[in-house]
Amino acid sequence: LHLCDRRQRQMCIRDRSKCRIVSYKSTLFFINELYYVGEDIMMKMSNFRWKVAWLIFIVSFVSYMDRVNLSVATPVIMKEYGFDKIDMGLIQSFFFAGYALMQVPGGMMAEKFGHRITGSLAVIWWSVFTALTAVAKGKFSFAAVRFLFGMGEGPIYPAFAIAIFRWFNKKEKGNASSFLLNGSFLGPVIGPALTVVLMSTVGWKMVFLIFGIVGILMAWVWHKYVPENPAESPYVNEAELAHINEGRTDVPIVKKAAPWGKLFTSVQFWAIGVQYFITDYIMFVFLAWLPLYLMEAHGFSLAKMGIWAAMPWLTLIIITFSSGYFCDKAIAKGASQYWIRTLCGSAGIIICSLALYIATRTADPMQNVMWLSLSLGSLGLTFNASWACAINLGGEFAGSISGWMNFWGNIGGVIAPTLTAWIATSYGWDAALIATALSGVVGVLAWFLVRPDKAIV
């Protein structure tokens, strides 16, 4: 064996694909982050980090399945317990209150104790209270259970942000973030139809028990396969570890608290929170009320709603995945992080608001679903830009930055169900959707204060 010369090493750093070429005479591989050439020796990058990305996708999917099942069961629960829209809006808001409350503490927990422990405990906690939703009897017990369920889900996304920071090359963070987001968005795609099928066969209460059991199983998988440091994983070889650590300065795996004094004086810190407040506010209007809206405003049956309510979320998945891929490609080729992330983030909200307004002017049910799909789907541009920016701005403090951002997003979630219910009850569904569309103006303005190319800390 002999060390690569400087030219060979620089070639390998510039074009990682060259390191994967299999040759018996001159095969490049990695040992302790050095590049060697040897005869009859082959090493290919293991790419286990993308299996971790798919696991993040699945856990995110389960988390949103656990949220959307209440929205789908809302008509049945309202009838069984005599609740009205405002009652259900308040119950939904209690979930988001608990969820928002744990965002910043969840980020601090993920940084202090690591994404493995924090993520596992969060999934177990929320799964227990998902199951306990089945035993709630009145609006106060429903509200209490959903509040505690929200507290359990609170730390998971900050934990995922830390995992992405530790497990992925800095040029892959946008694409990795799209796995996190699209797992969340797949829940409302499959959730309505699956929940309707389960409700029709075993009743709405068993739906919550089944999802609770699935969540506990996922907590075990996360704890087993995603250690704090990729170097501790038996599935990550030296080639992949060197790729993950390329251009990275060493940071401790378990670390001290974020510099909150510096963060609170940063305009970017507040701007990324404000734009995400608007982004999540709009999304949670869809999450909380889309099923009932389609049934009341456009006469969809329960079975038909279970199918068509998935279309906006499916569109969101497609746009989020594609935007994450193409934005990362553009940045890797030298495009400005500021323009790529900022333009995508603001354009997503603009298109969303315009399409949502057009949906209110459309009487045909299928055209309405089409415009709603474009509206929610365009937020894929914004979601992807938001999480990539949070990770870039925070670096080793990505858990705290993403927790702060998600905290404001879920303040939007606290307000959206109840405010939308009140407007819809008082003035009709069209007024509720127009008010939602108008909120986008604030989000667009906030985006132009975010500079993803300039880290806060």
Language-model features and meaning:
Residues 82, 114, 135-141, 169, ...:
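Helix-breaking motifs and short loop linkers at transmembrane-helix boundaries and internal kinks
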Residues 70-71, 266-321, 383, 387:
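Extracytoplasmic gate region of multi-pass secondary transporters
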Residues 1-15:
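Single conserved hydrophobic/aromatic residue that forms the stacking wall/gate
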